Amino acid sequence: MINILVHGLGQDEKSWNEVKNQLNNNGINVETPNLFSIVKNYQVNYDNMYKTFADYCNSFNEKINLVGLSLGGVLVIDYITEFPEKINSIILIGTPYKIPKTIFTIQNIIYKFMPKRIFENIGCSKKDAISLLDSMKNLSIPDKAPHIKSNTLIICGEKEKDNINMKSAKQLNKVIQNSKFKIIENAGHEVNIDNPIELANTIYDFWEGQWKNYKVTTKLQVSN
């Protein structure tokens, strides 16, 4: 089995470091691709990012456990829609049910005033980040999510309880038949950064536990 953690927009593969370390310490190996690195030979937009991400996943011969945060979750939904036979299970973290076009527009305006070095730190240019966000505005997740049949865990940070991301998580839980829902305490949108220990524990328990009796009970060994 291949385990892949997919970062969100504004992150890179290092955003998973603490989660990855905790899982490694407990005998689970994970892959953490950098989305901007795998799309570097193409114009940066969502279609090209998905194509290169799908090629990356298809390079593995084994079935896959996919974990995606935000943008990563959108890619996971598209991948399982096209290649359901490749998937063992998926975890969606802070993943939108409907693309918030107004929020994306505001975010792009903010991006235009941010220093270039902030984007360079995650391996992309300001221009590429703006282009990517623009290309995602018309994606249609509601057409795809109800057709997901694999075991699915949907996660949202506790601090998002009053915003659109919590509503999205509950809606995904409603329309995906074999899904369960988990709130991670002391975390906002970037759950992998805000509370990596509890997230790693939750991922471990979901992957290693019995699906029908899934609940967060197993405790991971915490590295120093």
What are these model-predicted stretches?
Residues 148, 154-157:
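Short beta-strand/loop motif that positions the catalytic acidic residue
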Residues 8-11, 70:
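Active-site glycine-rich loops that stabilize anionic/oxyanionic intermediates
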Residues 17-20, 29-65, 201:
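Active-site loop/oxyanion-hole signature of alpha/beta-hydrolase fold enzymes
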Residues 186-224:
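Catalytic active-site module of serine/aspartate enzymes centered on a nucleophile-bearing elbow/loop
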Residues 81-82, 90-116:
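Flexible "cap/lid" loop of the alpha/beta hydrolase fold
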Residues 128-144:
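Active-site nucleophile elbow and catalytic-triad environment of alpha/beta-hydrolase enzymes
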Residues 68-76:
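Gly/Ala-rich beta-loop-alpha elbow adjacent to hydrolase catalytic centers
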Residues 161-168:
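Conserved alpha/beta-hydrolase "acid-adjacent" motif
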